[in-house]
Regions:
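Single conserved hydrophobic/aromatic residue that forms the stacking wall/gate
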Residues: 159-169
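Flavin-dependent oxidoreductase catalytic cores
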Residues: 1-161
Length: 169
């Protein structure tokens, strides 16, 4: 007889018993929504995307995006940016116990994000992908994941994922 039970997902030292993850969605995945999804069986939560530059410059809009509750563990914070130094510093800043992992956004197609060389624009620059992931991994001792899209051409996805994997080594 075949079992319908999903196997746990392991990311670094985190085991997600029910391997259904709530994707980060700007304007949607605030704390109340994440708690509702947790009640309904989501095994891992992720915040809305938070700007590394916003954190760096103390933008007051950033803090509410990072609200957490112990009921939603494990929870990841999703950060985005294009400056490796700032990304590393802000990864260290949010390494305060609220989050079990960091997800780097390299998939957002919103024009104002892409114009700043952030989000999905990063997929056109594997060297910068490597630098951003490397700076984040070096700054913390938690798992780092990367959200990417299909890409701009046939090779884009491979170059991006290869650069991210190499940076984590």
């Amino acid at each position: 007889m075949r079992s319908n039970k999903l196997k746990p997902l392991v990311i670094g030292d985190i085991t997600i018993e029910h391997p259904l993850a709530l994707a980060p969605m700007a304007g949607v995945t605030d704390l109340p929504y994440r708690l509702l999804c947790k009640e309904q069986g989501a095994g891992m939560m992720c915040t809305e995307m938070v700007s590394a530059k916003g954190l760096y410059y103390g933008n007051r809009k950033s803090e509410p995006l990072m609200a957490t509750d112990s009921k939603e563990i494990p929870v990841a914070i999703q950060i985005f940016g294009s400056d490796p130094e700032i990304m590393g510093q802000m990864a260290a800043k949010v390494n305060d116990g609220r989050f079990q992992m960091i997800d780097i956004n390299m998939g957002c197609p919103v024009p104002k994000v892409v114009r700043n060389g952030e989000g999905s624009a990063l997929m056109k620059n594997p060297k910068l992908v490597y630098e951003l992931v490397s700076a984040t991994v070096k700054a913390i001792k938690k798992p780092v994941t990367v959200k990417i899209r299909k890409g701009f051409d046939d090779d884009c996805l491979l170059y991006t994922s290869d650069a991210a994997d190499e940076a984590r080594s």
